[in-house]
Swiss-Prot record:
The lineage of its organism: Eukaryota, Metazoa, Chordata, Craniata, Vertebrata. The gene is MAL. This is Myelin and lymphocyte protein. Residues 47-53, 115-125 are extracellular. Pfam families: MARVEL (PF01284). Belongs to the MAL family.
Amino acid sequence: MAPSAASGVSSLPSGFAVFTTFPDLLFIFEFVFGGLVWILVSSSHVPIPLIQGWVMFASVFCFVATTVLAFLYVIGAHGNRTSWITLDAAYHCVASLFYFGASVLEALAAIQLQDGFLYKYYHENISAVVFSYVATLLYVVHAVFSLIRWKSS
């Protein structure tokens, strides 16, 4: 067992150090870009409700879960337990998969909006696709570095 795991010392930050350490700094950007996806998808024209429903579910779920997780880190709820490192890695892996699926489906919806709809709706969906892929990239990077932290704990 690694020395840090044996002694119960966690490498997770608490307090406002969450916003100054990597990869936890990415919480801010995940929050911003996830919120943009949520806003753009909810305000855009819905050509296929089932696809847009999954995109909304994924973006709202990740937005709320990221907010709650960041808040719990700030208040120090992890209490230096290593199980929170596992939770962090697992959540970001799941969020990466959710957002990747949502990004692909949102791109499909935008492609189908190309003909026969107002240009405004097409631009809103294209913006949602771009921000969704940015959010996916942020979650993937956070997941990779969380897995590295988990492996070394």
